[in-house]
Amino acid sequence: MIGDAMSEPTFATLVSRWYERSARDLPWRKPGIGAWAILVSEVMLQQTPVVRVVPAWEAWLARWPEPRALAEDTPAEAIRMWGRLGYPRRAVRLRECAVAIVERHGGVVPDRLDHLLALPGVGTYTARAVAAFAYGQRHPVVDTNVRRVVSRAIAGEPDAGPTTRPADLVATEELLPIEPAAAALASAAFMELGAVVCTARAPRCAICPVESSCAWRASGQAAPTGPTRRPQRYAGTDRQVRGLLLAVLRESTGPVPHRRLDQVWHDDVQRARALAGLVTDGLVEPVGEESFRLAGDGPPSPSPLPHLPHPPHHQR
């Protein structure tokens, strides 16, 4: 897979040197940042732009600088602190992860890959990222950006194509230096290259550290053929309604009456569906039959099910 003009140490070395000169100055990359801070950053960066994550990450770590601090707080406070980062289920899972770290590992983020994978909400990518970036281990860390870099520079293809996790991991691992610390640096460098230079639609090939040996450039740089990503519609969706409901609940210091939530959105059926989804996802819980609150924001409620409005007769 790797041609004579681009052996694995040459590729990794070139990209790593570029990274050390040109990488973005992000707070979770600073020397001395611990595994918990890196884990939090990786969870927040899933589906959320860096510019929005930085202030949220700093505020989160200021409040909960270690897993035990978060584990001792409530799910409701985690949801409040998550604010408008989006996909707030991540906040609940991050707290569950903190609880597991305290119970299973004495409050220290584990360094073994299998132990990381066993934590709630931690998947293959996040586990490998923490093992590499926090503990300097040799693991291929593969996201969309890395897949695109490998596809273009090594295979000469403009698009990475469908995800094939085992093959992607193997292809990326072949590029890593043998020495663990150098491999961890290369993993971060590959990711950064795909994020800021080898981008999906407007690659900056002129400043790429491997431009001269890139298989895609050598083959004539065929245009990407994959589907163009369209921005997901937000206005009028259940996601918007969920966000509006959560905003009211986050700002409340106690249970919120159902009638107050009824004012959030005009469509009774959609509002009821969104509220039921928040309950199912463990973000919101009923208090009695006519009020709701953020999960864990008070003593257990005797009522296990929310009281949801019936749809209008013409919509049944």
Question: Where in the sequence are the language-model features?
Answer:
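Short, amphipathic alpha-helical interaction segments positioned at domain boundaries
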Residues: 298-316
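Short beta-strand-to-coil "C-cap" segments at the C-terminal boundary of structured domains/repeats
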Residues: 98, 294-299
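Short amphipathic alpha-helical interaction segments
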Residues: 265-280
